[in-house]
Every structure is written in C-alpha cells, then in structure tokens.
Amino acid sequence: MKHIRNFCIIAHIDHGKSTLADRLLGATQTVTAREEKAQLLDNMDLERERGITIKSHAIQMEYTYQGQEYILNLIDTPGHVDFSYEVSRSIAACEGALLIVDAAQSIQAQTISNLYLALENDLEIIPVLNKVDLPSANPEEVSDDIIDLLGCKLEDIIHASGKTGFGVENILAAIIEKIPHPKGNIEEPLQALIFDSHYNPFRGIEVIFRVKNGQIKKGQKIKFMATGNEYFADEIGTLKLNQVPKNVISAGDVGYLISGIKEAKEVKVGDTLTDAKTPTTNMIVGFEDVKPMVFAGIYPVDTDDYEELRNSMEKLQLNDASLVFAAESSAALGFGFRCGFLGMLHMEIIQERLEREFNMTVITTVPNVSYLAYTKKEPEVGMIVNNPTDLPEPSKLDRVEEPYIKATIITKADFVGNVMGLCIEKRGVITNQTYLTTERVELNFDMPLAEIVFDFYDRLKTVSKGYASFDYSPIGMRTSKLVKLDVLLNATSVDALSALIHESNAYHIGKKMCEKLKELIPRQQFDIPIQAAIGAKIIARETIKALRKDVTAKCYGGDISRKRKLLEKQKKGKKRMRLVGNVEIPQEAFMAVLKLND
C-alpha cells in the first residue's frame, strides 16, 4: 500500500489536462505507441468533437522510480463549471492533485474554485505550469501568480508541456515523493467509496470504486449500504486502458466491479460498498448529492416513445449522477419529463447524448430555475416551483423567492467596464473588485441564477473578447418581483412556452418572443395572433398573416355581386377554420426562445 498513489488533475477548460494525461500514460508505458491518440481518456465521441472532458475517467499506471515499482491511479476530471460535481467526486477518491495552469492564460476562475475544493479535502497540491513551449507563454509572471495563490516556493512549480512531453518525468517524480500514500487498514471490514458507474448493455452496471479499508475478493458477497442490496462480485479488476481482471483489490487501490446489476436505481454514486457477512458500520462521509440548477421539460417528438425515453434517461442517469428527472405532462406536448441539469452546457450535452446514444429525438422546453412561492394563505410555507405552470395565481400569491449566486469573474483590466455593464443588465450587484495584477481584475457580483442560465456565458465571452473566465456558487434565496409570462397562440395558451421573468424585463422579452415566433411558425390558411400576456393583460402582439387563395380568379367580367358572394363565402370558411384550426409549433421555435438576443 505504501507504493500506491491516487491523484487527480484539476485545471480550467483548455489548460491542457487531457493532453498532459496522454503524456503521463505514454511515459509510464500504460499505452503502447500504437494505441496512443489525442484525448485518450475522453472516450465519448461528443467529448472528442467538442474537445472537452465531460466525465471523469480513472486509469491505472505502473512506474518504476529509483528501483521501486509504484502504482499510480490517475483520475482525469472535467474543467467546465457545469461539471464541477464530477470534479468533487474525483477529489473525494484521491490524496493529491496536479494543479495545471496554462503559461499563456494564467490562473482562471475555474482553477481557483477547483483548487478550493481540493484544499477542503486536504489534498497535496502539485503546481504544474503547462504549455511553456508556446510563443505567447509568460512563465515568470504566471509563476508569481501561482505563488500568490498557493503560497508555495518558486522551485515547487514544475514546468511542463503536454505537447512535447517536456517535464513529464519531473511530474511523475513529484507525484511519488510529495503525494502521501493512501491510509487504510487491510485487516478491517471492507469499506469502499463508489465514485462512478457506467452502463454496459451486455454485462449490466460497472461500478468504479476506491477501497478505503479492507479488501474485496472475486466471488465475495458484497452489500451496497445506501440501498442495502447484496450481490456477488462476479468480476473485479483494475482499470488500465482496458479492464484487467484481478482476484483481489486491497485498501488504497481503485478498481471496477461487475455483478450483473441491471437496475439503474440500485447503484448510487457516493455510496459505500462493504462485505455482506461482516459489514462495516460506518459509511464514508463527506459526499453530498448534487443539486440541479436548471430545469427544463424533455418530451418525445412522438408520444408513443415515452417509455423508451424513460429507459434512455435511466441509463444516462447511471453514467451521469447529476441528471434528475420526474414525469410530467403538458397540454401542448403530451407526456414527458421535467429534468434537472447543472447548467446549459449540461442540458445541451444530455440532449445530444439522447440523440446519439439512444436515437431519441426530443423537444426541450424553455429552461428555468427552481423558485420558492409563498401564498397569502400560508405566508410562512414555501412551495418549490420547478415549472412555471405550477405557480399559484397572482391573486393568491404573496411573494416569490429566486436563487441567487455569487459570481466570480476574472478578466483583463481593459474589459472591466463591458463586463460590469453586462452584469448590471442581468440584475447583478457588484460586491467586490480586486486587482490581482495590473492587468487582471477579479470582480464579484451577487446575481440571480435565472439570469445566467440563458446566454450569459456566451455574452461574457463576447464583451471580453474571450478573455473573461467565470465561476459561480449558490448563496441562497431572495425575494424578487417575478411575473409569469404566457404565450398565447390563436388565443390558447401554450404551456410549454411559459416562463417566469422579472417584472422589469417582461415587456422586452414578451415582444421579442412574439417576433421570434412570428418568424418560425409556418403560415396557415387563417390569421394567427401571437400574444404575450401577464395574467389577463396582453403586453405584446404579432400576427401571422393568412395565406390566401384567389377565389375570384375564375370570374372574368360580369357582375361584382358574383365576386362578392365568393369572397363572403371564403371569409366564413376562414372564420370557421380559425375556431377549429390548431397551430403546430416547430421544434426550432422552442429552442429559439432561448436565444432571444441573436
């Protein structure tokens, strides 16, 4: 056990985590030159295409250092703010972390937030300055930034390049010398933390765990403590590039377990595994459930696919512990699910994974956050509102509270004005402004979560020419003046387009919604009024003009009354049509409402 090291890699997006992980795997000969390819651990097509890490990946390396063999378990983590729960899970399974900072971009908001996570878990931090071979690299200045942040010595910082492989040997040496070996006792009852799970269609659920105490043997009967279910360990082993079956995995090591579990609900990430005969009494603590930030409805395009969609969602949930969903129905879209996501990127990715991995085409409704509504009858008891249609009527409503966040934005000094302008437009209140260096400024805002859900991230990048980085943490609920904006098509409300909006933005957003829908809804044989309403008050309107057939074309010359008769008849037909006609809303219309500023 003294020769095991568990570590993870933390960094901001695009600071080169996955590339450096590739180099470490190459240097320890975990992968042969033939198997090597870029982003080796990112095994989802989506991850490769977007060049981001979505899932944490575990892999075991063997390395000989000063004549002694060591086992290094690397857990690669995502850098995007939406996936910070993946990072927190990986951190719980490690003793040390490589903090990677890009020599050209310096420290970013995400680097700091992940670093705090690691420090809370008492991890040993090894600072690595990556991409030192770039022409735009500025190692001296960035080293000073790292020293200010960590309080380490200049000689502690390892210079490296994921591209050329420079400095990789030094990193491996530092991992072995600085990161403490796992503490644990082989003699005690089995206690292992589940930090990930995958669904394999042939073998059921693969559980990935880290043993804290005791050991797990092949064929042993094990128990999941959260659910109390017992299974036989049909196959256990370690994770190299492919799985390597073993007969026993002892304290301190990371491995996988296959026991033919088919039900997604049986395996909870963060649960403790133990021996069924002599179970441990205490679960591994310090692991909290992730709270979804953004809610949206997901509906099958064809209502017959509802059950299939449920199965797909359950399988996705296995692999992505942060996805939460509950059944709901909508008058406009039929049966579907209300899903909770970590953020907009997460929502997009779930939608793409449903389409790719399960061939499901789905309709997504306008995303919103979770509100607390208080009625006049019970002004002390708040009801949770995840769906705008659940909001009580305005006459019964006392007040609505919405979640606020503390946003940390790090940007270049030139763009401070632009960034502040954007945040104030989004109802943010500045709480702090610090100059980290003469060039870089950290801004802190308190702002409503609902405002950053839509397009905040994209617009922040635009106003700062791509330089600003952003991170947020929730700070609780605050009372706000919110109204429910309904969209009426042909005088009937479309529940899937309803949204909860701050009073000050309501007119502006209502008008834009109507204009956007006018462009996207195809013309019919009759006029379609599109209206935005708050309660009974209409605040904006657009009309989609009717397509008209020329009924008088067959008359030439002759009496005007003949033509009039035909026109009157057409008018009656249109009137009847408007009463019974229903308007189909294309999928683009639901999505376009999200991007009102384009």
Curated annotation (Swiss-Prot):
One of the protein's GO biological processes: positive regulation of translation
Protein residues bound to GTP: D14, H15, G16, K17, S18, T19, N130, K131, V132, D133
Keywords of this entry: Cell inner membrane, Cell membrane, GTP-binding, Hydrolase, Membrane, Nucleotide-binding, Protein biosynthesis
GO-annotated cellular components: plasma membrane
GO MF annotations in UniProt: GTP binding; GTPase activity; ribosome binding; translation elongation factor activity
Every tr-type G domain range: 2-183
Family of this protein: Belongs to the TRAFAC class translation factor GTPase superfamily. Classic translation factor GTPase family. LepA subfamily.
Protein name: Elongation factor 4
Species, as recorded: Flavobacterium psychrophilum (strain ATCC 49511 / DSM 21280 / CIP 103535 / JIP02/86)
Gene label: lepA
